[in-house]
Amino acid sequence: MSRYSRIAGTGGYLPRQVVTNDDLAMRVETSDEWIVERTGIRRRHIAAADETASSMAEIASRQALEAAAIDPHDLDLIILATSSPDRVFPSTACLLQQRLGVRSCAAFDVQAACSGFIFALSIADQYISAGNANRVLVVGTEVNSRSVDWDDRSTCILFGDGAGAVVLESATEPGIMSTHIHSDGHYQDLLYLPNPASNGEGSDESRTIRMQGSEVFKVAVNTLGRIVDETLEQNGLQKSDVDWLVPHQANIRIIAATAKKLQLPMERVVVTVDEQGNTSSASIPLAFDEAVRDGRIKRGQTVLMEAFGGGFAWGSALLRY
């Protein structure tokens, strides 16, 4: 009998502190109108001093586990995507495991920048399909605010903090229909966060996110268009078969371009970038959780998730919820 994975539960967490565009305009030369026109972002959530990637992940994970009616001790695997880990090592997944009081399963991190959740979901799906796991917790969690240069208007306007999670469980019919992941390291210098501990990258200036925005935008739009075609073709589906697009929340113009490629009206696209900014690997599970909980996404509907980020790394997941 074939084995598949399905999403059994979702969860999400956003910090209480909110920074608006007007707040940023008091610090750098910008305005609410300028930011909204170029990005679609109006506000973003910022982690408190005592919040970390693992603490936010715990809240989102407990919500997802409760929604799935699964005890943490019944998990076979924890996969956590982040570019802002609590520590270089051990993995933030291990720290989350400790917070959940679990000892019996493996736990590890995935680092694929803004595409991290898709990469983690793909790995989890493979574990379940191969019969090596029955229940997997997949998390995206980020504290981007601690890697942002708050005096650089090109990046400080973009990023927010938060965590999202899903529980995957084995099923006899496809939930996850396919996943597709790709990377091309030749673009590494267009979007990156240096490691201060690495040789030659230890200056104070290099401890913040660096991005060549216009170049990233061009590649992202073209690349996401191609992965939409790849995903539909592999599954023998037409654009009209997709009920919902849940994209990485980087920029409303990129999101709109992908929706246009799918011939989807924006009413069938889950958009959170206006209220949350770019939460990197957390953005897709946060958006998915919101749309599930408010009733927009219903059981049996077909959902396309897609993401693009530093590396470059990009990917998609097609699923029947």
UniProtKB/Swiss-Prot annotation:
Acyltransferase is among the record's keywords: yes
Pfam families named among the record's database cross-references: ACP_syn_III (PF08545), ACP_syn_III_C (PF08541)
Record comment regarding domains: The last Arg residue of the ACP-binding site is essential for the weak association between ACP/AcpP and FabH.
Gene: fabH
Function: Catalyzes the condensation reaction of fatty acid synthesis by the addition to an acyl acceptor of two carbons from malonyl-ACP. Catalyzes the first condensation reaction which initiates fatty acid synthesis and may therefore play a role in governing the total rate of fatty acid production. Possesses both acetoacetyl-ACP synthase and acetyl transacylase activities. Its substrate specificity determines the biosynthesis of branched-chain and/or straight-chain of fatty acids.
Species of the source: Methylococcus capsulatus (strain ATCC 33009 / NCIMB 11132 / Bath)
Name of the protein this chain belongs to: Beta-ketoacyl-[acyl-carrier-protein] synthase III
NCBIfam families per record: fabH, PRK09352.1
Residue ranges, annotated region (ACP-binding): 249-253
MF GO annotations: 3-oxoacyl-[acyl-carrier-protein] synthase activity; beta-ketoacyl-acyl-carrier-protein synthase III activity
Subunit structure comment from the entry: Homodimer.
Cystine connections: none
Keywords: Acyltransferase, Cytoplasm, Fatty acid biosynthesis, Fatty acid metabolism, Lipid biosynthesis, Lipid metabolism, Multifunctional enzyme, Transferase
GO CC, alphabetical: cytoplasm
Active site: C114, H248, N278
